[in-house]
Amino acid sequence: MKKSIVSVLLLAITFGFFGKSKAQEKDSLYEARKLKIDEINFVSGYYTQEGEHSSIGGGKGDEALTNISNSIQVRLLKNSQKYEHRLDVAVAVDHHTSASTKLINNVPDGSPTNIYSGKISAKTAASSGTSGVTGASSKFVGWRIYPSINYFAKNLERNTTYGIGAYYSREFDYQSIGGELSFVKASQDNNAEFSVKAMAFFDQRLEILPVELRPVNTGVNNKKADDDEDEHEGNDDNYKLWNKNSYSVNFAYSQIINPRLQVSLLADFAFQDGLLSIPYNRVYFTNNTVSSEKLPMQRMKIPLGMRLNYFLGETFIFRTYYRYFFDDWGIKAHTAQLEIPIKISPFVSLSPFYRYHHQTSNDYFKPYGQHNPGEKYYSSDYDLSSFNSQNIGLNLHYLPLESKIFKSVDFRYSFYKRSEGLSAHNLTFAITFK
């Protein structure tokens, strides 16, 4: 699912490379305009993957997954003599099917006994009528909805922009509320720009354990009230409800060096606390016991990056990107990307792209059956393992210049391959209406 979201962001960056019109000169007799719809963006994506390291199966099992996503964004503009106001309202819906999801309520073939002592109940969330953050029906499993709203006010005299945004996301076992504040300052000649954005997300996740790890004396099986003083709380369905908070500050500085060369420097600082593990991910130990994934309750992440765009005449643009990432869980990663938009005609451009990623393993990752029972933290999620990945694809951008309805149309395809075996295909279609 994350990769389909990344594709949407990449499309947004690609839009307008060859379709930007020259900025109009300011008129001293400028008149304020009423609120109007500036454009409507529709994006639809299809993502499918295959692999054999299911995290729900403890690092072993079918990872086949299909995700279909659709989003629509309406952009409203209103100009006054001093300010330009912009309001973006969007809603997106995803639906995915996963081969390993059924293993939450079913014991994998050949699975050993659980790490808990005592009798184990095989009563499932579906049979107890509990399957959501607030009691949602099991028919919503696989669905995700995430609306957002963003407002920006640009001071035309000072060339500064202030922004505020709100986000919401909901799945059958997870919900998130977030917000952001942003500030952008551009030079008077628009050759340099500095931006900063602060974001915070407050998430809640139900502690839905694999079926064989649900003791009879807790949670859903005996409807026990939550009257303890631990860091989580119960809900009407008697699943434990855990919190996760995420905070980040993003800095960016861009500079036009000359008419052909533009450079951007990027730095992000992120901190998370709360439940950072996924309760229904299994971990198998060397003594033939099994437990759910357990990771530290805090994490700090710092990505540092740079973009360099070089315009070779009116036909080619070389867009390069590099990022170095590290966190306090032991991961260090390098990512490099090259994209070359090629102007075929005034209406059409093609953009082949290639992305390479290398990362070291998380301190708490081990493959299936290799964790020791005495370890404090453990995970067999291969997203936290050491691997190399490659992503290659092509974007087709079409500008119907004479159309009174369509502003741009994009098709984007990519193929993703990881050294540990995971592979994926991603197809995205985007259209912007005037």
Located regions from the model:
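Residues that define the transmembrane beta-barrel architecture of outer-membrane proteins
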Residues: A64-N70, V141-P147, Q175-G179, N243-Y247, ...
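Repeated loop/turn-to-beta-strand initiation elements of outer-membrane beta-barrel proteins
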Residues: K82-L87, E157-Y162, N190-F194, R260-V263, ...
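Outer-membrane beta-barrel translocator domains and adjoining extracellular loop/strand segments
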Residues: E52-G58, S100-N106, Y174-S182, E207-R214, ...
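Membrane-embedded beta-strand positions of outer-membrane beta-barrel proteins
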Residues: I40-S44, L87-V91, Y162-I164, F194-A198, ...
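Residues on the lipid-exposed face of transmembrane beta-strands in outer-membrane beta-barrel proteins
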Residues: I72-L76, P147-A153, L181-K185, F251-Q255, ...
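Outer membrane beta-barrel transmembrane domains
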Residues: I120-S128, G135, A267-A270, L275-N309, ...
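Outer-membrane beta-barrel translocator/channel fold
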Residues: S54-I56, G61, A90-P147, E193-R260, ...
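Transmembrane beta-strands of outer-membrane beta-barrel pores
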Residues: S44-E50, V91-T97, W143, A166-F172, ...
